[in-house]
């Protein structure tokens, strides 16, 4: 009898700092996830249909579309997709408050995110 393995959870990582996005994707791939890195909120939204992520991990402050805007669109288009945001910017609080006022709640991690903490969140 052939043994079937469960598909790897798909994680889309969005950060306009390419080194951070790529590094997180490498860490996640090595930890047993199928991860892809994109470098803008717009690209994250574009990838929703073709990659079909189980989770979006996004920086909040990015050039163009913010991570919060991408997260809201992600939840609208893929309601089962979990969202985790991270940021090292103080301005994040204002953006989160605006999203909260519109009925959107997001979990946020402080940047830099230690890989152990990130993996614990993803597996928890």
Question: Where are each of the predicted segments found?
Answer:
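The short loop immediately C-terminal to the conserved phospho-acceptor aspartate in CheY-like receiver
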Residues: 17, 60-61
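The feature encodes the CheY-like receiver
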Residues: 21, 63
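Charged docking surfaces used in two-component/phosphorelay signaling
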Residues: 22-30
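Short hydrophobic/Thr-rich beta-strand motif most characteristic of the beta2 strand and flanking loop
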Residues: 32-39, 47, 109
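Acidic catalytic/metal-coordinating carboxylates
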Residues: 39-43, 66-70
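Active-site beta3 strand of CheY-like receiver
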Residues: 51-57, 84
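Hydrophobic/aromatic residues positioned on beta-strands within the core alpha/beta folds
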Residues: 86-88
